[in-house]
C-alpha cells in the first residue's frame, strides 16, 4: 500500500511540477514582452519629443530667413543692383535681423565673391556691416552655403559645423535672392545650435541628432558631440531596421537598445543600456523561481497527504 501511495504521489507531484513550470515560463514570457513593449513606447515618445524640437528649430529659422528675404525684396531693384547700394540700403536690415533673431551672422554673398555681413565684428566696429572678400582672401562663391542655394534655387541648409569664433556648433540657412527676375546675391543666416542643444539636453533619456553627414550636432550627453566618437554601431543598426523600430547593438562589449527616425535631412536617435529591460526581467525571473519552488514544495506535501488519506 505504501508503495502505491508513493507512486501516485510522485505521479501527481510530477504533473503539478510540470504544470507550474509551464505556467512560470508563460508568465516570464509575457512579463518580458510587457516590459519590452513598455520600454519601446517610452523610448518612442522621448524620440518624438526630440523630433519635434528639431522640426520646430528648423521651421523657426526657415520662417526667419523667408521673412528677411521679403523685407529685403520690398526695396526697389535700384536699391539692390550694386554692392554699394546693398551696403547702404540693406545693411541696417541685416543688423536688425541679427539682433532680433539672436543670430550669429546675417549676410548676402555677391557673385563677385564679396560677402556683406552683419556679425559680432561689425558690432565691435559699431557699423551695420563689414565686408569679407578679396581684401582678406575670401570668396563667397566658393562656399557651400552659396553654391548650394544658388544651384538649387531653394533654401539650402548646411551640415552642422563648429564656428571658428565661438567654437560652438552652428548651421547656415541660405537662399538665392532675385528681384524682378534678376539675381542679387545669396542671403544667409548663421544659427548657433546652443538653443537646440539645451532643449535636447533637457529631454529625458539618451537622445541625440545626426546631420546629413552622420555627425552628431545635439545630444543629451554632450560627450557624444566629440567628433572622435565612433557612432557606426548605432547608424548600422538603424539602417538595418528603419524608422521608429527598436533595435539592439553592441558598444564596447555592452548590449544596448535604440530607435531612430529621419527628421528632414537629420536623424534623431535614442539609446539605452539593455539593462533597462534585462534587470527588471531577471528580477522578475528570480521572484518567479522562488515562488515556483515554494509552490512546488507546498503542492508536494499537500498531494502526499491527500493521496495518503484517500488510499488509507
Tell me what each language-model feature is.
Residues 178, 213, 222-289:
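Extracellular/periplasmic juxtamembrane segments that couple receptor/chemosensory ectodomains to their
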Residues 84-100, 182, 186-224:
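Solvent-exposed, extracytoplasmic
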Residues 1-41, 289-301:
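Extreme N-terminal signal-anchor transmembrane helix of membrane signaling/transducer proteins, especially
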Residues 41-49, 57-154:
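Extracytoplasmic/periplasmic sensory segments of membrane signal-transduction proteins
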Residues 99, 118-191, 196-199, 248:
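Extracytoplasmic/periplasmic ligand-binding sensor regions of membrane-associated signaling proteins
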Residues 9-10, 27-57, 78-85, 277, ...:
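Juxtamembrane interface helices immediately C-terminal to a transmembrane segment
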Amino acid at each position: 500500500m505504501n508503495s502505491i501511495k508513493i507512486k501516485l504521489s510522485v505521479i501527481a507531484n510530477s504533473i503539478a511540477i510540470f504544470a507550474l513550470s509551464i505556467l512560470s515560463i508563460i508568465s516570464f514570457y509575457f512579463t518580458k514582452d510587457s516590459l519590452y513593449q513598455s520600454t519601446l513606447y517610452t523610448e518612442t515618445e522621448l524620440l518624438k519629443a526630440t523630433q519635434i524640437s528639431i522640426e520646430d528649430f528648423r521651421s523657426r529659422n526657415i520662417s526667419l530667413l523667408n521673412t528677411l528675404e521679403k523685407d529685403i525684396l520690398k526695396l526697389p531693384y535700384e536699391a539692390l543692383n550694386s554692392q554699394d547700394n546693398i551696403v547702404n540700403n540693406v545693411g541696417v536690415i541685416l543688423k536688425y535681423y541679427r539682433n532680433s533673431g539672436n543670430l550669429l551672422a546675417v549676410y548676402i554673398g555677391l557673385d563677385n565673391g564679396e560677402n556683406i555681413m552683419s556679425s559680432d565684428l561689425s558690432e565691435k566696429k559699431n557699423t551695420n556691416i563689414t565686408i569679407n572678400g578679396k581684401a582678406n582672401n575670401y570668396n563667397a562663391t566658393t562656399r557651400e552655403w552659396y553654391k548650394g542655394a544658388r544651384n538649387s534655387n531653394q533654401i539650402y541648409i548646411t551640415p552642422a559645423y563648429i564656428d571658428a569664433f565661438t567654437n560652438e556648433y552652428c548651421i547656415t540657412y541660405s537662399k538665392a535672392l532675385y528681384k524682378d527676375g534678376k539675381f542679387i546675391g545669396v542671403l544667409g543666416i548663421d544659427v548657433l545650435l546652443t538653443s537646440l542643444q539645451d532643449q535636447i539636453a533637457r529631454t529625458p533619456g539618451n537622445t541625440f541628432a545626426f546631420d546629413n553627414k552622420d555627425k552628431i550636432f545635439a545630444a543629451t550627453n554632450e560627450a557624444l558631440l566629440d567628433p572622435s566618437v565612433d557612432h557606426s554601431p548605432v547608424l548600422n543598426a538603424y539602417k538595418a531596421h528603419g524608422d521608429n523600430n527598436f533595435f539592439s547593438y553592441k558598444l564596447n562589449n555592452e548590449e544596448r537598445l535604440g530607435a531612430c527616425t529621419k527628421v528632414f535631412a537629420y536623424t534623431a536617435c535614442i539609446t539605452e543600456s539593455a539593462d533597462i529591460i534585462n534587470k527588471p526581467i531577471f528580477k522578475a525571473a528570480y521572484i518567479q523561481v522562488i515562488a515556483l519552488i515554494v509552490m512546488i514544495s507546498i503542492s508536494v506535501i499537500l498531494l502526499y497527504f491527500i493521496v495518503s488519506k484517500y488510499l488509507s
